[in-house]
Amino acid sequence: MLANVIVIGAQWGDEGKGKITDLLSRSADVVVRPQGGVNAGHTIVVNDQTFKLHLIPSGILYPDTECIIGSGTVIDPKVLLQEFDQLEALDVSLDRLYISQTAHVTMPFHRLLDQASEEKRGEHKIGTTGRGIGPTYADKSERMGIRVVDLMNPEILRKKLLWTVEYKNVVLDKLYDLPPLDPETVIAEYTTYADRLRPHVVDSSLKIYDAIHQRKNILFEGAQGTLLDLDHGTYPYVTSSNPIAGGACVGAGIGPTMIDRVIGVAKAYTTRVGEGPFPTELDGELNQHLCDRGAEFGTTTGRRRRCGWFDGVIGRYAVRINGLDCLAITKLDVLDQLAEIKVCVAYELDGKTCDHFPGNAAEFARCQPIYKTLPGWQCSTEECRTLEDLPPQALDYLKFLAELMEVPIAIVSLGASRDQTIIVEDPIHGPKRALLYANGDPLA
């Protein structure tokens, strides 16, 4: 049965999409990264080897899987080539990696402007990674960006960079009091990158379209998370692209009718990096416990993640915005030692109960969580491989999350390794959401 599947983060990113995509890549012929840049990192553990990637799709670790970096991404060639080196040193072939000719390129001035802008914001900072993602997307929107195809033509690259660097130097000087960049140095550096990237550059939309018509299984690997979406997230504390399911279609260059299934990934609790409202955020010992047990430090920046209880309100929002068919719940094992676990089922907003995510940032900042308290299981789940292996309280917790979010759970992750996983239902070829709920079991 043909299946083209989108994997989406259902929270604020860092949900464990890398591991889930890696697992699903076994059934995929092609894995596509449709949007985002080096601000998104995913960690995969295979045979005790840890792979930390930012741009190259997780499927690269499977020898027969093609991987495509789509048009909606922004590419930092320096970081991408570092990933080339990391993988080639481990004898991972890159012959199956393709890069969209229309993806935009992050330049040195983008990184400088990102960092300078964040510093100038002071207490109003967004909490960006400082990797130049926002300024790269801004140039794309202002129609002054440089694309991968421009790197492939030295004359066009020189012409565009001479003008762009001159323009950016004025901004760096007048607005941020920073020294100018030498355009010749930038041109020389990026010309070198072009030589190595050239064999991988393709019309990615056409390649994906051809794969669909060849009846290949395609996995679209989303970056960041739903609540970081530029239009539908906790604006302004968001990323500069659209990491929701609809954004995957745009970034890949295909129509929405070509998608068969959307899988959401969520932690068994909630985290976020950077600034912005976070209703279920914890402090003190509980926050420290989740951070330590979950190793909650960003793959990209190393920043400590903020930790809190599972938020069912934003979970239901993610189901609605993305049209999720099923869920993968990760890091259930992080909760193993807790005597009781809370889940946010609604908010109190200005004295009234609110059961939906308010798009207004000021209102969201005033939301107070309304909790349902469930008993913990206080024993290890790391060796569980079936639902029957789980403690009854852990199984009840998962069922509660599925019922709260009104979407079935297809995968449960209990650690970083591939084998620390329970496959509840085939997330690619199994029944759709409506059928599972007709059967009455959210963990069917």
Swiss-Prot record:
Record bears the keyword Ligase: yes
InterPro entries: Adenylosuccin_syn_GTP-bd (IPR018220), Adenylosuccin_syn_Lys_AS (IPR033128), Adenylosuccinate_synth_dom1 (IPR042109), Adenylosuccinate_synth_dom2 (IPR042110), Adenylosuccinate_synth_dom3 (IPR042111), Adenylosuccinate_synthetase (IPR001114), P-loop_NTPase (IPR027417)
Pathway named in the protein's UniProt entry: Purine metabolism; AMP biosynthesis via de novo pathway; AMP from IMP: step 1/2
Pfam families named among the record's database cross-references: Adenylsucc_synt
Documented EC number(s): 6.3.4.4
UniProt cofactor(s): Mg(2+)
Residues the entry annotates as binding substrate: T299, T300, T301, G302, R303, R304, R305
CDD domains: AdSS
Annotated S-S bridges: none
MF terms in GO: adenylosuccinate synthase activity; GTP binding; magnesium ion binding
Role description: Plays an important role in the de novo pathway of purine nucleotide biosynthesis. Catalyzes the first committed step in the biosynthesis of AMP from IMP.
Name this polypeptide is given: Adenylosuccinate synthetase
Taxonomic source organism: Synechocystis sp. (strain ATCC 27184 / PCC 6803 / Kazusa)
Gene giving rise to this polypeptide: purA
